[in-house]
């Protein structure tokens, strides 16, 4: 136990200190939680003070229904506690077999895409996940040329004694993409666009890019892994998932000479990344990066100032922006 944990127990639950310390020191203690990971915009240039936190909790496969319910109740209480600090947290309970079953059993909700996207959700997780606690993710450390051979390669390494699966969390490879998933994921982004239109513009166009490359989509998650394992630190994406999305979209639209859409996407990216710039010092890395990008795009000072004045836009300008967003989303869909 850390000093903080020991002090907390001593003050709040002194009667439990001895039992908890004994359990922690026991080799036979059962650890139901294998790993905790946050995904999405966390740590990226698009994260703002209003961004929510999507947290995956990977637990043992054999937890009873009652144990899963108790774990879910605990995450609910943590979410309620976080809300008192104006932080929105969403927890998702996962097992390592979740994506191998080729079915996403949870129903469609405001924060859960259900079966609308399957491999695409896992790909987003791999390209943006940050490990908070627990075991590292095997997929991020194991390079396989053909994703369809990922499971076979893992089995080979385990059989050869070169890999201990108990040291890792493994949600599986990205070799089971289906064309229908792009349709479901696009619908989901249209729905999410109601609350987060600028982010949805980026994501739905990435789906369009992937769909054009199907069945050999050049996944950002694989690009990140290849760069990491090869020691190649590229100045293009900085291992930032949203900068990488913009780069891929830009390559796709430029190749198709769709410069009007490219310009609109850049505007959406700028707006999303600068939503709370008033909170930051002028030397903040996000401000410096966006200024550099705007200069590379050839934007005028007037255009930048106009976008920076979004909170003061008149109703006519707001309506125009909304209509442009809706038209763009529908065109990409």
Question: What do these predicted ranges mean?
Answer:
Residues 1-15, 101-109, 126-333:
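Nucleotidyltransferase catalytic cores
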Residues 1-35, 67-73:
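Helical scaffold of the NTase/Pol beta-like nucleotidyltransferase catalytic core
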Residues 23-27, 35-47, 78-82:
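Catalytic micro-motifs at enzyme active sites that drive phosphoryl/nucleotidyl and oxygen chemistry
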Residues 30, 49-50, 65, 69-72, ...:
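Conserved structured core elements
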Residues 45-69, 88-91:
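Catalytic metal-binding acidic patch
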Residues 70, 74-90:
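E2/UBC-UEV (E2-variant) core
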Residues 87-109:
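Short, conserved secondary-structure transition motifs
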Residues 109-118:
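Acidic, Ser/Thr-rich peripheral helices and adjacent loops at domain boundaries
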């Amino acid at each position: 136990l850390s000093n903080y944990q020991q002090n907390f127990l001593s003050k709040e639950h002194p009667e439990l200190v001895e039992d908890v310390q004994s359990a922690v020191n026991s080799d036979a203690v059962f650890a139901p939680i294998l790993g905790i990971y946050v995904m999405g915009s966390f740590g990226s240039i698009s994260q703002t003070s209003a961004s929510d936190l999507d947290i995956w909790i990977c637990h043992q496969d054999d937890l009873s229904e009652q144990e899963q319910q108790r774990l879910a109740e605990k995450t609910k209480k943590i979410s309620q506690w976080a809300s008192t600090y104006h932080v929105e947290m969403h927890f998702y309970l996962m097992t390592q077999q979740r994506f191998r079953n080729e079915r996403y059993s949870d129903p469609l909700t405001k924060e859960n895409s259900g079966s609308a996207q399957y491999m695409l959700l896992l790909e987003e997780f791999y390209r943006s996940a940050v490990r908070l606690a627990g075991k590292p993710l095997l997929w991020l450390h194991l390079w396989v040329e053909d994703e369809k051979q990922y499971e076979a390669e893992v089995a080979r390494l385990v059989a050869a004694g070169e890999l201990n699966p108990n040291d890792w969390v493994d949600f599986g490879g990205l070799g089971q993409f289906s064309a229908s998933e792009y349709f479901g994921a696009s619908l989901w982004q249209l729905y999410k666009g109601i609350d987060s239109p600028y982010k949805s513009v980026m994501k739905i166009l990435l789906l369009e890019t992937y769909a054009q490359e199907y069945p050999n989509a050049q996944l950002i998650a694989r690009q990140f892994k290849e760069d990491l394992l090869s020691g190649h630190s590229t100045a293009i994406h900085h291992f930032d998932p949203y900068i990488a999305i913009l780069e891929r979209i830009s390559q796709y639209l430029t190749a198709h000479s769709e410069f009007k859409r490219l310009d609109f996407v850049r505007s959406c990216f700028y707006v999303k990344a600068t939503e709370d710039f008033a909170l930051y010092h002028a030397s903040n890395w996000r401000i410096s990066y966006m200024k550099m990008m705007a200069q590379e795009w050839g934007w005028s000072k007037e255009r930048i100032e106009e976008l920076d004045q979004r909170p003061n836009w008149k109703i006519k300008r707001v309506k125009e922006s909304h209509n442009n967003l809706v038209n763009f989303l529908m065109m990409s869909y």
